[in-house]
């Protein structure tokens, strides 16, 4: 028989419960004190008399990172940072649409090798930028988007233009943070700038609520009641608000490092480089395809070009790598890429992806040995489990890899008949282009002929910005950029509407360059209003609008396959007159002055050199040049 346990004394559980309750209460109070910054405030005081504001901290970090321009469309949420940038000598360039500001920052990033910066106001100001931010993500452009926001205290309470902005931008940005205290502005922005350029470059987003940007006295006026409230609840609320405000500004103006943080850029290992050297050294018909990543810092374009010339392997150039070898270089192969890839025995994909542009890898021969190098592992191996397989996949910086590859292949040569075979195919294709340029069109001008004349007129110091479908697709075959980083297209996202923003960023980054924008008439509709921006800021750029009164790239497939041109028609609009209404110069090219194409182009150049933005409205007919081109 078991002896029953002695019953516990009735009051013995109470001290334990009391201890647990007290501990929980203390922990809760300590947590609340930490969140309110009460401990931080003991060591870092609030300068209540200061008229300084968080915008000054933003501007100081941007200046320390070498930022010279900030693109914006003004809004009350971000006014302090714009004013502070102006005071520190950072040029504030305001556009007529927020998406243009981000496109301009994208172009600035691509051409400068640093971070492009745009600032827009809260809510709809930010949502207007989503397309441009996604475009920058897919183009791997390091941009910093600064977004205004409602007060930290009023978020999720129905404030004006308050939405969950971080949720919108997390899928698009490498780094996505909302600043909650003034003292956090500097370290957050430094981390954002480093993240934008490290690894695979891309956009970053920093949300700046109004109460971390405006001065103490203004935030206090909005946040804390002027008269002390009566009653216990009122006093508790007042105490909470005063401490919340103090935490916002505690230590706000204490000195902090503002300069750049170290970047994390992946590099190929010596063993990987050596294996690639051995593969390429045995090649008989080597081929290289260079993409935009090859032009990323730290490798300069001049060093990369010298390395490619030393290597002696024929190249296809895409994206920002277009123009790397200049005009008519013997190693630069421009046409018949699919056929060349099928014939090559070793292919180096240097910053090039097997997406739709390489038919998802289907254009690569299974008998070819493929070396692929890319900073992004996921992108590097895209579709490799389906249509192609790399012999060597190297995650690392493309430009640095090419330089190391050339070092390992010193003295290596390849039979000249392989390059000559590819160049002969180029010459045959160019002959067909000349024949198409000579063909009459039903009305207006032959776009192939016009673009050949553009190619002959284009100066060596030009930067080409291309924005459109059919007209721009034709230009890609006929007009050659004169050097590296002199061709700006949207990239893999295929975005229409990049033209004005890209031109804006390009001209400010390279003021001595002539910026030539090639627009389709459909795409030009997105950019027309920004000629007001060019006029106001005295930014002379030249726009050539291929005006065939339609969305022709879509119409080419829609009409024969579906039997209707619905939604594809536009008008032969007087875009040159519309530009003149905005204060720019406007010129017209049509069948009436078809013998003066070069003269009109020279007139446009001269007006640009005199400081005026110019639109040349080129009325063109339709040809079969791009029949069968991809529209989806």
Curated annotation (Swiss-Prot):
Mg(2+) binds at residues 521, 547. Keywords: Endoplasmic reticulum, Fatty acid metabolism, Lipid metabolism, Lyase, Magnesium, Membrane, Metal-binding, Thiamine pyrophosphate, Transmembrane, Transmembrane helix. Binds 1 Mg(2+) ion per subunit. Binds 1 thiamine pyrophosphate per subunit. It is found in: Endoplasmic reticulum membrane. Its EC number is 4.1.2.-. The chain crosses the membrane at residues 13-33. It is an enzyme of class 4 (lyase). GO terms for cellular component: acetolactate synthase complex; endoplasmic reticulum membrane; membrane. It catalyses: 2-hydroxyoctadecanoyl-CoA = heptadecanal + formyl-CoA; (2R)-hydroxyhexadecanoyl-CoA = pentadecanal + formyl-CoA. Expressed in all tissues tested, with highest expression in heart, pancreas and placenta. Thiamine diphosphate binds at residue 98. GO terms for biological process: fatty acid alpha-oxidation; isoleucine biosynthetic process; L-valine biosynthetic process. Residues 470-550 are annotated as: Thiamine pyrophosphate binding. InterPro entries: DHS-like_NAD/FAD-binding_dom, THDP-binding, Thiamin_PyroP_enz_cen_dom, Thiamin_PyroP_enz_TPP-bd_dom, TPP-bd_CS, TPP_enz, TPP_enzyme_TPP-bd. Its cofactor is Mg(2+); thiamine diphosphate. The keyword Magnesium applies. Endoplasmic reticulum 2-OH acyl-CoA lyase involved in the cleavage (C1 removal) reaction in the fatty acid alpha-oxydation in a thiamine pyrophosphate (TPP)-dependent manner. Involved in the phytosphingosine degradation pathway. Belongs to the TPP enzyme family. This is 2-hydroxyacyl-CoA lyase 2. It comes from Homo sapiens (Human).
């Amino acid at each position: 028989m078991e002896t029953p346990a002695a019953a516990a004394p009735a009051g013995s559980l109470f001290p334990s419960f009391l201890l647990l309750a007290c501990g929980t209460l203390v922990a809760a109070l300590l947590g609340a004190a930490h969140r309110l910054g009460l401990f931080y405030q003991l060591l870092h005081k609030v300068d209540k008399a200061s008229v300084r504001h968080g915008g000054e901290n933003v501007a100081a970090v941007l200046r320390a990172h070498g930022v010279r321009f900030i693109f914006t469309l003004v809004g009350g949420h971000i006014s302090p940072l714009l004013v502070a940038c102006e005071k520190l000598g950072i040029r504030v360039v305001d556009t007529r649409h927020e998406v243009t500001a981000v496109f301009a920052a994208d172009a600035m990033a691509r051409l400068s090798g640093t971070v492009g910066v745009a600032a827009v106001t809260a809510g709809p100001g930010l949502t207007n930028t989503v397309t441009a931010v996604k475009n920058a993500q897919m183009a791997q452009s390091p941009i910093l988007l600064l977004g205004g926001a409602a007060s930290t205290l009023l978020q999720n309470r129905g404030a004006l233009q308050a939405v969950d902005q971080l949720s919108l931008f997390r899928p698009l940005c490498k780094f996505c943070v909302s600043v909650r205290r003034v003292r956090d502005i500097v370290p957050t922005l430094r981390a954002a700038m480093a993240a934008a350029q490290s690894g695979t470059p891309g956009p970053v987003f920093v949300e700046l609520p109004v109460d971390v940007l405006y001065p103490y006295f203004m935030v206090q006026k909005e946040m804390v009641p002027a008269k002390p409230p009566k009653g216990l609840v009122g006093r508790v609320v007042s105490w909470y608000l005063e401490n919340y405000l103090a935490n916002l500004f505690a230590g706000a103006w204490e000195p902090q490092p503002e300069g750049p943080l170290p970047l994390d850029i992946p590099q190929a290992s010596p063993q990987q480089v050596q294996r690639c050297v051995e593969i390429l050294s045995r090649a008989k018909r080597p081929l290289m395809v260079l993409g935009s990543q090859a032009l990323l810092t730290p490798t300069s374009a001049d060093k990369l070009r010298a390395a490619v010339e030393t290597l002696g392997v024929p190249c296809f150039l895409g994206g920002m790598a277009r123009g790397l070898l200049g005009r008519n270089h013997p190693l630069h192969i421009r046409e018949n890429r699919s056929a060349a890839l099928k014939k090559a025995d070793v292919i180096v994909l240097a910053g090039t992806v097997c997406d739709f542009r390489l038919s998802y890898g289907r254009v690569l021969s299974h008998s070819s040995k493929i070396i692929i190098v890319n900073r992004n592992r996921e992108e590097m191996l895209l579709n490799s489990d389906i249509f192609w397989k790399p012999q060597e996949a190297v995650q690392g910086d493309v430009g640095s890899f090419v330089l190391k590859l050339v070092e390992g292949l010193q003295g290596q040569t390849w039979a000249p008949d392989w390059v000559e075979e590819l160049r002969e195919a180029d010459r045959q294709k160019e002959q067909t282009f000349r024949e198409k340029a000579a063909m009459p069109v039903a009305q207006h001008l032959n776009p192939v002929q016009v673009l050949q004349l553009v190619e002959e007129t284009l100066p060596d110091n030009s930067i080409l910005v291309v924005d459109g479908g059919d007209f721009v697709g034709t230009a890609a075959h006929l007009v050659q950029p004169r050097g590296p980083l002199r061709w700006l297209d949207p990239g893999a996202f295929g975005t229409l509407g990049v033209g004005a923003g890209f031109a804006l960023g390009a001209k400010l980054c390279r003021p001595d360059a002539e910026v030539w924008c090639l627009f389709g008439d459909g795409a030009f509709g997105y950019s027309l209003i920004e000629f007001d921006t060019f006029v106001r800021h005295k930014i002379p750029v030249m726009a050539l609008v291929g005006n065939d009164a339609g969305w022709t790239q879509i119409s080419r497939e829609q009409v024969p396959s579906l039997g209707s041109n619905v939604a594809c028609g536009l008008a032969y609009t007087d875009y040159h007159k519309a530009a003149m209404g905005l204060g720019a110069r406007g010129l017209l090219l049509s069948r009436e002055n078809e013998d003066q194409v070069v003269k009109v182009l020279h007139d446009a150049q001269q007006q640009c050199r005199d400081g005026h933005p110019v639109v040349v409205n080129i009325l063109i007919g339709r040809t079969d040049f791009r029949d069968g081109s991809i529209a989806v």
